[in-house]
């Protein structure tokens, strides 16, 4: 069901010259990162799968918080820190050299996705059908996500 989305950490060459490069996801806490937050204000934790398959989640540090990919990319290109963005959105910048892919030995666990909707109490039939279809199309990758979906309390 569609192409897997992959988030990657990127930074400008100028930022890397100034601050150096992280060697593990955990070392990102020592760098200025450009954060993204959820609607409730909680900051997004960066997730990685390492070369040996281990999963790590990092609560990065940084004062700049944005809610748009374009702003995050522009901030990274301007040398304001490390951004965690969809690889498909920065292919031109990576090719041009204005951004550098950091931690290339690590990958984002792109086997999950979210469907946001206002309430589970009175979900319209077409939306329920769509969710069922998406879950059926992705049954081989859902695992924990299916359990999470079912265990959420009713709104």
Task: Kindly label every feature range from the protein language model.
Residues 1, 24-26, 37-38, 55-56, ...:
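Short secondary-structure boundary/capping segments
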């Amino acid at each position: 069901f569609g192409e897997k989305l992959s988030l990657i950490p990127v930074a400008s060459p100028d930022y890397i010259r100034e601050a150096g490069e992280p060697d593990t996801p955990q070392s990102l806490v020592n760098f200025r990162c450009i954060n993204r937050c959820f609607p409730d204000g909680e900051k997004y934790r960066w997730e990685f799968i390492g070369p040996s398959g281990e999963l790590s989640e990092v609560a990065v540090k940084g004062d700049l918080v944005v809610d748009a990919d374009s702003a995050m990319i522009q901030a990274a290109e301007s040398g304001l820190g490390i951004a965690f963005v969809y690889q498909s959105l920065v292919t031109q910048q990576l090719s041009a050299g204005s951004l550098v892919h950091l931690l290339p030995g690590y990958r984002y666990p792109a086997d999950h996705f979210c469907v946001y909707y206002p309430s589970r109490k009175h979900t319209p039939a077409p939306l329920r059908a769509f969710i069922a279809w998406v879950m059926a199309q992705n049954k081989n990758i859902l695992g924990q996500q299916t359990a999470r979906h079912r265990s959420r309390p009713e709104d």
